[in-house]
Swiss-Prot record:
Protein residues bound to substrate: S237, Q259, H262, H328, D361, E415, H420
GO biological process: L-histidine biosynthetic process
Signal peptide span: none
Gene (UniProt): hisD
Binding locations of Zn(2+): Q259, H262, D361, H420
Organism of this sequence: Geobacter sulfurreducens (strain ATCC 51573 / DSM 12127 / PCA)
Catalytically driven reaction(s): L-histidinol + 2 NAD(+) + H2O = L-histidine + 2 NADH + 3 H(+)
PANTHER family membership: HISTIDINE BIOSYNTHESIS TRIFUNCTIONAL PROTEIN, HISTIDINOL DEHYDROGENASE HDH
Cofactor binding note from Swiss-Prot or TrEMBL: Binds 1 zinc ion per subunit.
Name by which UniProt lists this protein: Histidinol dehydrogenase
């Protein structure tokens, strides 16, 4: 863990190591992923089975045998506690309610005589959602990807999840059923992304792939983009907490560790105007680390990519936050609503001392699939918009074309596109 002062002349150099996390590994895996994609594209189910045996240690006679059955889903419901099912149902309901507000309708404008202009909103026909299965089980990822797709009106939702040993976590299966997933395959990695992108004899080709995964999954999504749509290239998770010396150090420490336990590349940063408060938080992190079941992962993350930064003012802290555009931003200050309008770049913003980032991870309502690695400067959280496409609608009557046609021809002539102009002038009276 680094204890830094933003006013030090060498601050940028010291902080650069945190910003660069994972860059070198991304370059190393690209050729491996390219080969896997090409193989699945060429050999389909056969290649998919081979990679599933090799990477997931899962034996199957056919890809069809990798599809989860109705009996398996019913068995999952029997294994999950009633209170856990109730919590997942509540999460689905709240996430659906939030995303309903994002829906856009087809519209037509008739403000001009003889001309209709508008936009048609159409759900995607089929999407694939990737649910990670590595160092933890993530039913919340199912909900956050499948529910907005269902709210958008997507025709079919196909889910893939890596399952070393062959059994998908029952909480994940329950979440999939509650969220409206149609088909589930026990497969993961770059090979699953390739199968969704190009289709095989058994796995249907989708229009878009969403959901987080490891570096191989992220690279595969990047490489199949264009063949299919993708949501974003998600990197390691991150949290930035802005603090003014108010609040409880133990709370801030717990929030920092909630990200550190994700994986070793996760980054947890506190920037505070109160050095003493920062020191208390650092001490509290060490105390809480020893109590975590995932201590090894969290400690590696905290010691390598964690930081406590002292700022001279909230102005400095806000400017720093806008510069790095964090995935999760907590405003753990006395008056969070006062500084909220000054936040320009963040995936999700959590206000006040009683809004831990974990509330947004699970059932507050907004999506937890967020831009990472500074991409919140230009990317947004996953939403209903990711599962629809929009078509422009244009209608001119003869009178409408006669009214605007000469100007259309004039612009076509400016560009030297004679046939464009003629396609209009030939219709003019």
């Amino acid at each position: 863990m680094r204890f830094l002062d933003i006013r030090d002349t060498n601050f940028d150099a010291e902080f650069a190591a945190i910003l660069a996390r994972g860059e070198e590994t991304g370059r190393e895996v690209e050729q491996v992923v390219l080969d896997i994609i090409a193989d699945v594209r060429a050999r389909g189910d056969e290649a998919l089975l081979e990679y599933t045996r090799r990477f997931d240690r899962l034996e199957a006679d056919s890809v069809a045998a990798l599809q989860v059955t109705e009996d398996e889903i019913e068995y999952a419901f029997a294994k999950v506690k009633d209170e856990e099912i109730a919590a997942l149902k509540l999460a689905v309901e709240r996430v659906a309610r939030f995303h309903e507000k994002q829906k856009q309708e087809t519209w037509l404008s008739t403000t001009e005589p003889d001309i209709l202009l508008g936009q048609m909103v159409t759900p995607l026909e089929r999407v694939g959602i990737y649910v990670p299965g590595g160092k933890a089980s993530y039913p919340s990822s199912v909900i956050m990807n499948a529910v907005p797709a269902r709210v958008a009106g997507v025709g079919e939702i196909v889910m893939v999840a890596p399952t070393p040993g062959g059994e998908i976590n029952p909480h994940v299966l329950v979440a999939a059923r509650l969220s409206g997933v149609d088909r589930i395959f026990r497969m993961g990695g770059a090979q699953a992304v390739a199968a969704l992108a190009y289709g095989t004899a058994t796995v249907p080709r989708v229009d878009k792939i969403t959901g987080p995964g490891n570096i191989y999954v992220a690279t595969a999504k990047k490489l199949v983009f264009g063949q299919v749509g993708i949501d974003m290239i998600a990197g390691p998770s991150e949290i930035l907490v802005i603090n003014d010396g108010s609040g409880t150090p133990a709370h801030i420490a717990a929030d920092l560790l909630s990200q550190a336990e994700h994986d070793e590349l996760a980054s947890s940063i506190l920037i505070t105007t109160d050095r003493g408060f920062g020191e208390q938080v650092a001490t509290e992190v060490e105390r809480q680390l020893a109590q975590l079941s995932r201590e090894t992962i969290a400690r590696t993350s905290w010691e390598t990519y964690g930081a406590v930064i002292v700022a001279g003012s909230l102005d400095e802290a806000i400017a720093f936050s806008n510069r790095i555009a964090p995935e999760h931003l907590e405003l753990a200050v006395a008056n969070p609503f006062e500084i909220l309008p000054r936040i320009k770049n963040a995936g999700a913003i959590f206000l006040g001392h009683f809004t831990p980032e974990a509330a947004g991870d699970y059932l507050a309502g907004p999506n937890h699939t967020l831009p990472t690695g500074g991409t919140a400067r230009f990317f947004s959280p996953l939403s209903v918009d990711d599962f629809v496409k929009k078509s422009s609608i244009v209608y001119f009557s003869a009178a409408g074309l006669n009214r605007l046609g000469r100007d259309i021809v004039s612009i076509a002539e400016m560009e030297g596109l004679e046939a464009h102009g003629r396609s209009v002038s030939i219709r003019l009276k």
